[in-house]
Amino acid sequence: MQYEIVSAGEDVDDERARGRRAAAPAAPSSAVPSSAALSSAALSSAARPTGAPPATAAARRGRDLPRERLLARGPAALSDAELVALLLGSGLPGHDVFALAHTLLARFGSLRALLDAAPDDFKGLRGIGPARTAILVAVVELARRALAEKARERPLVDSPGAVDDYLRLLIGTRPREVFVCLFLDARHRLVQTEETAHGSLTRMAVYPREIVRRALALNAAALIVAHNHPSGAVRPSAADRRLTRVLRDALALVDIKLIDHFVVGASDTFSFAQAGWI
């Protein structure tokens, strides 16, 4: 990863029923239906609402099964596709909701990539309109906010696992480089999280002076910074180490401590502090 460290002067056919009742021989008008026929007709009628095709009722029962299992056994009992299907609610003509969920997961490659997708990423996808896009984006934002609340409850230095989870959800699967700052108070509790720089796959301009200025404006006593590697490899580069030194020294001039710098991938993180590099 290369940095530009910038100084102050640079700125669902719901499946259609295909079965057809076999034509019964015509009975004389005086014929009385047998008790077996009456029982069969009663059971068939009770099996579905009046006017509903048999396949529609079956599809409805199929959608209900994951919901019932979730309520009875918890969300861990469901597959990724089943959980996505519950969010989507219904399918398309020719494709039930579970087929749509599988299609989405295949399109994005993983559940994490699906949930980290931006609204524009869903444009043109059959069956995913504005309402479903909003639901998928909102779910991830709720998770981020919940983790941020957790980070505010106690000092982040006492809960490194919470920091890892938060950062991976925040930037771990971004397709481009993002530099993020976690501004902390004197007790090392989270005050605010801000994305302070965005780059390409291999290069990003970072402004240490602007980060210091923002820390002073928020009355922060300490900082944790992080950036992602879209490749997934979290080993820091020489440029990563140089940036960390420059930022640490700039913050020290105004008595603000740089606690850690994380390099973040989709499934792993690297901590400068744990490596003894800060």
UniProtKB/Swiss-Prot annotation:
Could you tell me the keywords of this UniProt record?
Hydrolase, Metal-binding, Metalloprotease, Protease, Zinc
Q: Which CDD domains match?
A: MPN_DUF2466
What InterPro entries does this protein map onto? MPN, RadC_JAB, RuvA_2-like, UPF0758, UPF0758_CS, UPF0758_N
Give me the ranges of the annotated region Disordered: 1-64
Instruction: Specify residue ranges for compositional bias: Low complexity.
Output: 22-59
Position of sequence motif JAMM motif: 227-240
Recorded GO MF terms = metal ion binding; metallopeptidase activity
Q: Name one Pfam family in it.
A: UPF0758_N
Residues that, per the record, bind Zn(2+)? 227, 229, 240
GO biological-process terms attached to the record: proteolysis
- Please list the residue ranges annotated as the MPN domain: 156-278
The text of the family note is: Belongs to the UPF0758 family.
State what protein this is by name. UPF0758 protein BURPS668_0979
For this protein's source organism, the top of the classification is: Bacteria, Pseudomonadati, Pseudomonadota, Betaproteobacteria, Burkholderiales
